[in-house]
């Protein structure tokens, strides 16, 4: 029974597209405002952060376009929108710091991962990021393949 709890704590949903499309500059951990059925859906793994992004609107931070699908057990009259905007919980100093960075050219806010922390609370990792150009993406792919090949060669000599 203890193993089940441990696996639920370690549920991590990553936004792999963000790591591919952006250069990550700085990360922050934030709380997220959810409804009860959304928490249950996250525990079941019904989350997709692929197209999600973060915006600062009137001094508050929101996660937009994150897909948390509803459960089949929820009543049809009470089904929140799957892609609704969800408020992120941050200190005002953190919001001001992020806002000052975002107003610079080319820097955006991206949701990197959604996970359960040690207290079994759902947290989201938000990053300030700068978009990559096509040649940057190609260089990263080349570096990955070179690293993979060298690891394979080293492994074959062991």
From Swiss-Prot:
<dbReference type="InterPro" id="IPR023620">
    <property type="entry name" value="SmpB"/>
</dbReference>
<protein>
    <recommendedName>
        <fullName>SsrA-binding protein</fullName>
    </recommendedName>
</protein>
<dbReference type="GO" id="GO:0003723">
    <property type="term" value="F:RNA binding"/>
</dbReference>
<dbReference type="InterPro" id="IPR020081">
    <property type="entry name" value="SsrA-bd_prot_CS"/>
</dbReference>
<dbReference type="Pfam" id="PF01668">
    <property type="entry name" value="SmpB"/>
</dbReference>
<dbReference type="InterPro" id="IPR000037">
    <property type="entry name" value="SsrA-bd_prot"/>
</dbReference>
<keyword id="KW-0963">Cytoplasm</keyword>
<dbReference type="GO" id="GO:0005829">
    <property type="term" value="C:cytosol"/>
</dbReference>
<keyword id="KW-0694">RNA-binding</keyword>
<comment type="function">
    <text>Required for rescue of stalled ribosomes mediated by trans-translation. Binds to transfer-messenger RNA (tmRNA), required for stable association of tmRNA with ribosomes. tmRNA and SmpB together mimic tRNA shape, replacing the anticodon stem-loop with SmpB. tmRNA is encoded by the ssrA gene; the 2 termini fold to resemble tRNA(Ala) and it encodes a 'tag peptide', a short internal open reading frame. During trans-translation Ala-aminoacylated tmRNA acts like a tRNA, entering the A-site of stalled ribosomes, displacing the stalled mRNA.</text>
</comment>
<dbReference type="GO" id="GO:0070929">
    <property type="term" value="P:trans-translation"/>
</dbReference>
<comment type="similarity">
    <text>Belongs to the SmpB family.</text>
</comment>
């Amino acid at each position: 029974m203890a193993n089940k709890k441990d696996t639920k704590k370690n549920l991590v949903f990553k936004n792999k597209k963000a790591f591919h499309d952006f250069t990550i500059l700085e990360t922050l951990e934030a709380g997220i405002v959810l409804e009860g059925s959304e928490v249950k859906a996250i525990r079941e793994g019904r989350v997709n952060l692929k197209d999600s992004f973060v915006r600062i609107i009137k001094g508050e931070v929101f996660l937009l376009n994150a897909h948390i699908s509803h459960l089949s057990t929820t009543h049809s009259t009470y089904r929140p929108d799957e892609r609704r905007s969800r408020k992120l919980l941050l200190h005002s100093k953190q919001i001001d710091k992020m806002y000052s960075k975002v107003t610079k050219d080319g820097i955006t806010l991206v949701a990197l991962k959604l996970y359960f922390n040690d207290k079994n609370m759902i947290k989201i990792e938000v990053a300030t990021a700068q978009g990559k150009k096509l040649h940057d993406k190609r260089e990263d792919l080349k570096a990955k393949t070179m690293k993979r090949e060298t690891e394979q060669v080293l492994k074959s000599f062991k």
